[in-house]
Swiss-Prot record:
Belongs to the tubulin family. Residues 441-462 are annotated as: Disordered. It comes from Euplotes crassus. Pfam families: Tubulin (PF00091), Tubulin_C (PF03953). GTP binds at residues 142-148. Residues 453-462 have a biased composition (Pro residues). The lineage of its organism: Eukaryota, Sar, Alveolata, Ciliophora, Intramacronucleata. Coiled coil: none annotated. This is Tubulin gamma-2 chain. Tubulin is the major constituent of microtubules. The gamma chain is found at microtubule organizing centers (MTOC) such as the spindle poles or the centrosome, suggesting that it is involved in the minus-end nucleation of microtubule assembly.
Length: 462
């Protein structure tokens, strides 16, 4: 029985990458832009029901809720060839339609204002599921709606669905995209630490660099960058949609990658990479060894500078294509012999591999492709940059006027201080994880097992 997942797309960025994600899923499952299953896909062995449901007229509808405080991107989706794909009841745009003004606090307060309407949409989707496993949130942490409204939604998902998993695809910004983004990022990070079970970090800077360096795009468009993101998202869900012997549900996927509850931020790598509209002249033979070796190369990691220092806590390679399992074993041996991956001293130094089918409905230039999902202590470098930028602003109490105008900050700035502490603790946690004595850390502290900052939903597999 498929374990259903509901996708919540919040804000401009969240809806843009969500739109590309659904385009990709439709192509992979043989579903037309109107939601009709193509004749050539009638006998497919895939699990469409994880992310789609069938309406009474049998057309496929995404299990998705689309939220924004301004109408721009939602209207774009409603006017696109995919307009009839979505449930029209699951679009939400605020009545004022004036956005959050790149202000986390305004987005958060708007979330509280419209909580009842949003939860009603989500409840309706949940009631239509036979065995709901959890939620996926797509958003940016830099602006106002994705960060603020997204933060509020994360808290409410924990409150209303405490036993369901929450995974996010969170876009981390380019430098200085928005003046007040250090504030928005720190406030969002607190919720990603406390209220998500797993966060896939989508580093805009690194993804744009990959588009320039590897895809040879001189000036990558937002659509092209989002297409790369959708490729990663789709690949990370292939084991759920084309199930094999392992990692065929969300809890199994997360448990294999998150050894301790707080350290649940993942980086990604993908190879070989191309865009759907880009013809690639193939000059190499893709093998399992070639793909797995390339996934460990810095230039293929979609997180800036994160693996130059530190160690891997876990690696899961999702290999797609017609692959002989004996090739996997030989490839792992070769990689181990070359010692190309540095692991933490207190855990197993192993790369997990999940084999998955490729969609038979998409012509691929390569026989084998791979996605790496990795938990690496070096990811804290991204958090350190955000923390440093935030501290520079707070020293001068710069640009706080619009925050003080909102209910959450009108009396004091305690929420900033609380968020700062959570992020600092996260940075310290990842640094400590590089040391042999990490597993004994805090053993004398009776409250360690009841860390209030640990995600409430984390349930390790026995």
């Amino acid at each position: 029985m498929p374990r259903e997942i509901i996708t919540c797309q919040v804000g401009q960025c969240g809806n843009q990458i969500g739109m590309e994600f659904w385009k990709q899923l439709c192509m992979e499952h043989g579903i037309s832009p109107e939601g009709i299953l193509e004749e050539y896909a009638l006998d497919g062995e895939d699990r469409k029901d994880v992310f789609f449901y069938q309406a009474d007229d049998e057309h496929y509808v995404p299990r998705a809720v689309l939220i924004d405080l301004e109408p721009g991107v939602i209207k774009q989706i409603q006017n696109s060839p995919y307009s009839n794909l979505y449930n029209p009841e699951n679009f939400f745009v605020s009545k004022t339609m004036d956005g959050a003004g790149n202000n986390w606090a305004k987005g958060y307060c708007e979330g509280a204002k419209y909580e009842e309407e949003i939860i009603e949409m989500i409840d309706r989707e949940a009631d239509g599921s036979d065995s709901l496993e959890g939620f996926v949130l797509t958003h940016s942490i830099a602006g106002g709606t994705g960060s603020g409204f997204g933060s509020y939604l994360l808290e409410k998902l924990n409150d209303h669905y405490p036993k369901k998993l929450v995974q996010t695809y969170s876009v981390f910004p380019n430098d200085n995209d928005i003046v007040v983004q250090p504030y928005n990022c720190i406030l969002s990070m607190k919720r990603l630490v406390l209220n998500a079970d797993c966060v896939v970090v989508l580093d805009n800077t690194a993804i744009t660099s990959i588009a320039v360096d590897r895809l040879k795009l001189l000036h990558p468009t937002i659509s092209q960058v989002n297409s790369i993101v959708s490729t990663v998202m789709a690949a990370s869900t292939t084991t759920l949609r084309y199930p094999g012997y392992m990692n065929n549900d969300l809890v199994g996927l997360i448990a294999s990658l998150v050894p301790t509850p707080r350290c649940h931020f993942l980086m990604t790598g993908y190879t070989p990479l191309s865009l759907n509209d880009q013809k690639v002249s193939s000059i190499r033979k893709t093998t399992v060894l070639d793909v797995m070796r390339r996934l460990l190369q810095t230039r293929n990691i979609m997180t800036s500078g994160a693996i130059k220092k530190g160690a891997y806590m876990s690696i899961l390679n999702i290999i797609q294509g017609d692959v002989d399992p004996t090739q996997v074993h030989k490839s792992l041996q070769r990689i181990r012999e070359r010692n190309v991956a540095n692991f933490i001293p207190w855990g197993p130094a192993s790369i997990q591999v999940a084999l998955s089918k490729k969609s038979p409905y998409i012509e691929s230039d390569n026989k084998v492709s791979g996605l790496m999902l990795a938990n690496h202590t070096g990811i804290r470098s991204i958090f350190q940059v955000l923390y440093g930028q935030y501290r520079q602003f707070r020293k001068r109490d710069a640009f706080l006027g619009t925050y003080r105008e909102t209910k959450i900050f009108q009396d004091n700035l305690d929420e900033f201080d609380s968020s700062e502490e959570v992020v600092k603790d996260l940075i310290d946690e990842y640094a400590a994880a590089e040391k042999m004595d990490y597993i004994n850390r805090g053993k004398d502290d009776e409250d360690m097992d009841y860390d209030p900052r640990a995600p409430p939903n984390f349930r390790p597999i026995e």
